[in-house]
């Protein structure tokens, strides 16, 4: 909160290997008074340094990057204090396995790069407030993967002990709605 009672803007770090994409996201977020970009990096290794030096409220990262990709970065963050910073995966990959793996590794949100500015800002604010976000169009495949009975009829099993941020029964129930 600011001195006049307004909420402070959410501080964001953008990690994406495509410079033009980072510039575009930064420019779009600058249109909102509710979010401020405090740092950016072109790969996961540089991203870890930027996170440590800026202490953002939310980290926004791509999955596929040189030197250290998004999933490897999430693995690396798990053992650090920065693991408490909500992470939003913003990517072009709508693969169910990638989504589930990112969530298992601690990502709190997953959006495709075709979202609107309003959707992106709302997702950042939701994560900063402690919530989770998965782009609505992606939930159908996730629900099938998380369902009790896949098409083969054999129950699926997931190891919920892999991550402290694994989906809870209630979160799965909400996804099914």
Predicted regions, residues:
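Conserved acidic segment of CheY-like receiver
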Residues: 7-21, 25-29, 167
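The feature encodes the CheY-like receiver
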Residues: 21, 61, 66-67
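Short hydrophobic/Thr-rich beta-strand motif most characteristic of the beta2 strand and flanking loop
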Residues: 34-42, 50
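Acidic catalytic/metal-coordinating carboxylates
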Residues: 43-46, 67-75
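Active-site beta3 strand of CheY-like receiver
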Residues: 54-60
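Short, conserved "switch-loop" micro-motifs in signal-transduction and mechanochemical regulators
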Residues: 93-94
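Short, flexible helix-to-coil linker/hinge segments that flank and couple to helix-turn-helix
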Residues: 98-104, 108-109, 114-165, 169-173
């Amino acid at each position: 909160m600011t001195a006049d009672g307004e909420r402070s803007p959410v501080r964001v770090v953008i990690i994406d290997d495509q410079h033009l994409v980072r510039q575009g996201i930064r420019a779009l977020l600058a249109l909102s008074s509710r979010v401020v970009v405090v740092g950016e990096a072109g790969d996961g290794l540089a991203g870890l340094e930027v996170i440590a030096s800026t202490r953002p409220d939310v980290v926004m990262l791509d999955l596929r990057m040189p030197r250290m990709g998004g999933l490897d970065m999430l693995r690396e963050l798990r053992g650090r204090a920065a693991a408490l910073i909500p992470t939003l995966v913003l990517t072009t990959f709508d693969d169910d396995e990638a989504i589930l793996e990112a969530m298992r590794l601690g990502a709190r949100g997953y959006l495709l790069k075709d979202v609107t500015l309003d959707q992106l800002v709302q997702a950042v604010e939701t994560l900063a407030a402690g919530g989770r976000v998965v782009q609505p169009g992606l939930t159908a495949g996730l629900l099938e993967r998380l369902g009790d009975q896949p098409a083969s009829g054999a129950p699926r099993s997931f190891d919920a002990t892999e991550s402290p941020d694994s989906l809870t029964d209630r979160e799965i129930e909400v996804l099914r709605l």
